Design a protein with these regions (language model features):
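A short acidic, amphipathic alpha-helical/loop segment
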Residues: 43, 70-71
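N-terminal leader/targeting and pre-domain segments
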Residues: 1-24, 114-115
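Non-catalytic, surface beta->alpha helical segment in thiol-disulfide oxidoreductase systems
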Residues: 80, 85-115
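Short loop/turn motifs at secondary-structure junctions and domain boundaries
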Residues: 74-78
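Thiol-based oxidoreductase modules, predominantly thioredoxin-like and allied folds used
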Residues: 29-30, 53-70
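Structural signal for short hydrophobic segments within the conserved structured cores
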Residues: 8, 57, 93-94
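Local sequence-structure signature of Cys/Sec-based thiol-disulfide redox active-site neighborhoods
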Residues: 15-50
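Residues at alpha-helix caps and immediate loop-helix transition turns in enzyme cores, especially N-
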Residues: 39-41, 67, 98
Length: 115
């Protein structure tokens, strides 16, 4: 199944909770409105497309700030955008933000969720 068919757009705290309950091992991408978002999403797409076992939740932080803040509060991580967060068994196990979202970081995150 291609990545585009495994993406859920999350707009509320309840949707975030539902996504993570249904997909305890998954990835969240918090998308901002600056030029970094599309540039970093290239790495996300390239590394998640072949991983048919992983679903991707996307939070557009400008439109859905409560959902983004919920993730930060729930998992004790600072809100950033763009930001990639890997979950394994319902726990945040790896995250990167801004220009630290690279191919190397994606490989590292995938290694952590696959261990």
């Amino acid at each position: 199944m291609p990545l585009k068919d495994r993406i859920s757009f999350l707009t509320s705290p309840a949707e975030v909770d539902g996504f993570l309950q249904a997909n305890p091992t998954a990835v969240l991408f918090k998308a901002g409105s600056c030029h970094k978002t599309p540039e970093t999403f290239v790495h996300v797409q390239a590394h998640l497309d072949p991983r048919e076992d992983l679903k991707l939740g996307i939070i557009k932080v400008v439109e859905s700030r409560p959902a983004s803040n919920h993730v930060a509060e729930l998992f004790g991580i600072e809100h950033e955008s763009p930001q990639i967060i890997f979950f394994k068994d319902g726990k945040n196990v790896f995250d990167r933000d801004n220009w630290d979202i690279t191919s190397d970081a994606m490989r590292e995150g995938l290694k952590v969720v696959s261990a």
